[in-house]
A protein has these predicted regions:
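Bacterial N-terminal signal peptides that target proteins for export
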Residues: 2-13
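N-terminal signal peptide c-region/cleavage motif recognized by signal peptidases
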Residues: 19-22
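Patatin-like phospholipase
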Residues: 25-109, 124-402
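Active-site loop->helix "elbow" adjoining a glycine-rich segment at hydrolase catalytic centers
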Residues: 114-115
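Hydrolases whose catalytic domains are alpha/beta-hydrolase-1, hotdog thioesterase
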Residues: 119-122
């Protein structure tokens, strides 16, 4: 979740970890399980609430069964929320300001990764939850998210405990919110969150609406666990363990930040392409369609990147840690760009309007540390102002035609 700042210390941490690993012989023991058991595992006794995000299209197709617009033929409005740690304050502000403008859509599909996962339930439910969304990103402080000694954490499972983040999520995600998401799910809308199963090295797509509508007594607990897991950077935070069972064998799955696998889950590429029904033409195996048939023309794809995408020139200091941090930041931008480009190509091919917003280089406020509240307030205000006056959406990836 807080990768941008943690990257500054990644090289130092790696060096110390290599030294300490030999000493850390008291690691927590885990119940072994097999890959075959994982394929059939049911999380916390609640079946039918997830799939591999990189699964074949024929499998992903089931996740959009009974999606409202697919049944009525109406245009689809989709929102994808990226990772970005404390930079999520930008997306939160934009959504709140967009509500105030009176033009924010009622999204049919919302996806969230990492910090985008934390805000996704509120984005999905609309303006009546804007107060919670604002509180989440304007009242957050270092101590409300981080606890523990990072040096002692080198001998554990993460530099920091997820306990404070769990408390933050529990304070905002309650049974009423779960019930509202369940109602939206039954009305044909979909909310998805990505975590990374570290044992499998694969991204997991959680159908949060199906989970909310399951009626299972542990649904709220699992819902919260998924949000925390998606925002828990591996190594920085303890992983989130999710109880699972397969053929009578009980074990714990290890889940971490969804951004480990995907910085952004682009719905059109992995889900809508799977339906084979968006334009009424299914031409081949796995429901793939012929290009250019664009059935739901008029639909909208909105992508909010809680980060900056534009290159920012700076003479890099010739020091190991500065070089590592600069390289990591470059890698993150490149990863975002590739995903955005895929989304744009899909939208153009299928007749959707592509809409992109991200933090501009003109934003010059600097963060002075992890979870800098003043910095987050400035980012929230930036996004909020954009939303109120009318978001100037970019309809192509940056630098594509210039």
């Amino acid at each position: 979740m807080f990768i941008p700042h943690l990257a500054r210390y990644s090289a130092k941490i790696a060096a110390v970890v290599l030294t300490c690993n030999a000493v850390a012989a008291t690691a927590e023991q885990r119940t072994p399980y097999t890959e075959a058991e994982l394929e059939n595992a049911v999380p916390m006794g609640i079946p039918g609430v997830r799939a591999w995000a990189d699964a074949p299209l024929s499998v992903l197709k089931t996740q959009l069964a009974n999606l409202g617009p697919l049944l009525t033929g109406q245009p689809i409005a989709m929102l994808a929320l990226s990772g970005g740690g404390e930079h999520g304050a930008y997306g939160a502000g934009l959504l709140c300001g967009w509500s105030e403008s009176g033009h924010r859509p009622n999204f049919d599909i919302v996806t969230g990764v990492s910090t985008g996962a934390l805000m996704s339930p509120f984005a999905f439910l609309g303006s009546k939850y804007d107060d919670r969304l604002k509180a989440l990103y304007t009242q957050m402080t270092f101590h409300s998210v981080f606890s523990g000694n990072p040096f002692l954490g080198l001998f554990g499972q993460g530099l920091y405990s997820t306990a404070p983040l769990q408390r933050v999520v529990a304070s905002q995600v309650d049974q009423k919110l779960l019930d509202d998401i369940a109602t939206a799910y039954r009305n044909g809308r979909r909310l998805f969150v990505i975590t990374t199963n570290l044992d499998a090295q694969r991204p997991v797509l959680w159908n949060m609406g199906a989970l909310a509508a399951s009626g299972h007594p542990q649904a709220l607990e699992l819902f919260r666990k998924v949000l925390v897991a998606s925002a828990s950077v591996a190594g920085a935070f303890d992983p989130v363990y999710i109880d699972a069972e397969a053929n009578g064998h009980h074990f714990k799955e290890m889940h971490v930040d969804g951004g480990t696998a995907y910085p952004l889950f682009a719905v059109p590429v992995r889900l809508l392409a799977a339906t084979g029904e968006v334009d009424g033409h299914s031409d081949g195996q796995d429901g793939e369609r012929k290009s250019g048939q664009g059935g739901h023309s008029g639909g909208q794809i909105y992508v909010i990147i809680n980060n900056n995408l534009d290159p920012a020139f700076a003479v890099t200091k010739p020091k190991t840690f500065n070089i590592a941090a600069r390289a990591f930041n470059t890698l993150v931008k490149a990863s975002f760009y590739d995903t955005i480009l895929n989304s744009y190509v899909y939208a153009k091919d299928e007749g959707y309007t592509f809409n992109l917003a991200y933090i501009p280089n003109s934003f010059e406020v600097k963060s002075v540390g992890l979870v800098d509240q003043k910095y987050m307030l400035a980012l929230f205000d930036l996004g909020h102002a954009e939303g109120v006056r009318g978001v100037e959406w970019q309809h192509t990836p940056p630098r594509l035609f210039r």
